[in-house]
Amino acid sequence: PVVPLAMSDHPASVTFRTIGGEGDRPVSYSYGYANTGFVSAGERVYDSAYFKRIPAYLKKMAGGTDSISKLVEADKTLYVQGEVKDKPFTFNGIPMPTPFDKEQPAAQQFTPHAKKNYLVETVIADTWVMNVYEVSATGERKTIGVPKKDAGAN
């Protein structure tokens, strides 16, 4: 479940999640504004169904989490990106490029509004896709992110 953080009048709440990939493909999320560059959102984010199944001592050793929530500034374009950790194909211990190498999910941008909740979710499947949703109080999702433009201005 998306757990919104308590908000004052100004910030918006963003939750980062991963679906699929089991334990092999956690996603490292980062976010930032046009003039600040990206900062890490925190630990690697694993698929929540997978994360619930692994024993606590392994979680402590390996680190990671099944979701991260952050408060972000409202009415400023926010950029989000996720980097999927992939296991390279090796031949006799030598990493080899393969035609199956996946593209990292495209970075997204959106403008959060005060007191709203947003979900940044990467789905690990045949392709890796990251989407941004605005989540209503009733849990309905509306897709709002667009691929990040090179220009920082809207």
Q: Where are the model-predicted features located?
A:
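Short loop/turn and low-complexity linker motifs enriched in small/turn-promoting residues
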Residues: 1-154
